[in-house]
C-alpha cells in the first residue's frame, strides 16, 4: 500500500508540473508577442504610458547628467573585441524624471576615453523600458569603487550615484548622440528572441510521469509471476537442510 501511495503521489506531482509548464508556455508566448509588437511600433511619449510600462518603446526628452556614467560589464560575441562594457548614463527628462539609459557598448581598451561621450545637450531618446535587475548570489558584487558593474540593480545605482532614479531603465535604440565610433549602437531585436522553453519542460515532466507508470507496471507484473513448483520444492529442501 505504501508503494502504491508513493507512486500515485509522485505521478500527480509530475503531471501537475507538466500542466503548469503548459500554462507558463501560453503566458510566455503572450509576453513575447507583446514585446514584439512594442519593438516594431514607433516610440510613444513616456508620459502617455499610464500602466504596464515594461517593454514599451518610448520617447523621452532631456539631457544626460555628466560624470555619472556606469560601466556595465558585458561580452559582445559579434564584436571584433568581445570583452567590454555597456555605457549607462542617467538621463534627466524635461518632466524631472531621472532614468538610467543604456547608450551603447564599447570595448575594454576604450574604457579610458569613453568619457568623451559626455553630452549635456537637450535631445530625444527612443528606447525600450526594462525592469531593474536583481543581484544574483553566484555573481560577484558590483565593484562600485572601480566602476565595474555586473548587475544593473537600480536601488544600488541610486545609492551609488546619489540620485532618485526611476524603478526602470531604458535601452536606447540607434546611434548615441555623442556619435563616437568606439560606442557601438544597440539593437532591440534580441529582446524578441528570448527562448520559450516551457514546452520542452512540459514534455520532460509528462515523460517522467509516463516512465514512472511503465516502471510500476513492470514491477507489479514481475511480483505477480508464480514461482515454478520445482523451484518451490528446492527452496523447501534448502530450508529443511538448514534446520537439520
Swiss-Prot record:
Record-linked Pfam families: SURF1 (PF02104)
Compartment list: Cell membrane
InterPro entries: Surf1/Shy1, Surf1/Surf4
Claim: Ribosomal protein is one of the keywords in the record: no
The entry's keywords: Cell membrane, Membrane, Transmembrane, Transmembrane helix
Any one cellular-component term (Gene Ontology): plasma membrane
Statement: the UniProt record of this protein carries the keyword tRNA processing: no
Segments passing through the bilayer: 7-23, 201-219
Record's bilayer topology term: Multi-pass membrane protein
Record PROSITE patterns: SURF1
Similarity field: Belongs to the SURF1 family.
Full protein name: SURF1-like protein
Organism field: Rickettsia prowazekii (strain Madrid E)
